[in-house]
A protein has these predicted regions:
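An N-terminal assembly and electron-transfer interface module characteristic of large anaerobic redox
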Residues: 1-278
Length: 278
């Protein structure tokens, strides 16, 4: 997949810092599905958060084949506070990502890598939680990544959910001081899997709160909300307050709607539905 859009279209910076701390974020992903939600998340922070502003630069993995883009990526990483990557499974491009990020890993406030090749996953760092030894031990995370590589046909969602089930088992074997960082690592997956602009906004604020040197003027923490989770499968309607996990639940809501007439509530009335991958 080669793109004709320059990475600069994903660059967002605040118009006015207004005395706030500036956090630089760089991300590289396989496909552009997160671009809209991430952009909306950053714009919301810059417009509404009184304590922190975000400058973000984004790259699609294939764009790093271009020497010009790769040089820009290296420069952005060199000044970043937070690095995010997802689905880096192309060997030669994975090596380029590692080459650019590894020299700055220890300096970064946080490095979050969602399922990718082991050498990229080793960049993960959240406080005392690290994946630098991934593949060198028989840990649950190492076993997960091995199975993920062997079962490359499984979906991104399935892989995420497997990891979210595995991590709580890992936590009980960690020293107390590492447990909180491991929990934040797990929360990062939940924010990312949720994928909404609200989840991604709170994901960034969580990282800043826990790992950035940023505080409110009164010394309090940067506020954020827990991730909003969604059903693995469900029925979504744009006017409904939430997703429905089964047909009966959806029909109960549909039949009680005050905004439609009885003709549309007729079980034989035409209805159009779309089957979509989450």
């Amino acid at each position: 997949m080669f793109t004709h859009v320059k990475p600069t279209v994903r660059h967002i910076a605040p118009d006015d810092l207004k005395g706030r701390a500036l956090i630089n974020v760089v991300y590289v992903v396989l496909e552009p599905q997160y671009q809209s939600a991430l952009s909306a998340a950053v714009r919301s922070i810059n417009a509404n958060n009184p304590n922190v502003a975000v400058e973000i630069s984004g790259y699609l993995l294939e764009e790093l084949r271009s020497p010009e883009n790769y040089e820009a990526f290296q420069k952005d990483v060199a000044k970043a506070n937070i690095f995010i990557a997802s689905l880096i499974f192309i060997e030669e491009l994975a090596e380029k990502v590692v080459e650019a990020v590894q020299p700055h890993r220890d300096r970064l406030d946080a490095a979050i890598v969602f399922p990718s090749m082991p050498q990229v996953m080793r960049l993960n760092k959240l406080g005392s939680f690290s994946m630098a030894q991934l593949g060198q031990s028989k840990s649950a995370i190492a076993s997960f990544m091995k199975k993920r590589k062997e079962n490359s046909g499984s979906s991104f969602q399935d892989a995420m959910l497997k990891l979210l089930r595995t991590l709580p088992k890992v936590l009980k074997y960690l020293p107390v001081e590492k447990a909180q960082d491991a929990r934040n690592f797990m929360l990062s997956f939940q924010y990312w899997l949720g994928g909404s602009s609200e989840n991604l906004e709170n994901f960034l604020l969580m990282l800043v709160d826990k790992y950035g040197d940023v505080h409110a003027p009164d010394g309090s923490a940067i506020g954020y909300q827990d991730p909003v989770t969604y059903p693995d499968m469900g029925i979504w309607h744009p006017l409904a307050p939430a997703m429905f996990e089964d047909v009966k639940e959806y029909l109960n809501w549909h039949q009680s709607r005050p905004d439609i007439g009885d003709d549309l509530k007729d079980p034989l009335a035409p209805c159009v539905g779309l089957v979509l991958q989450r």
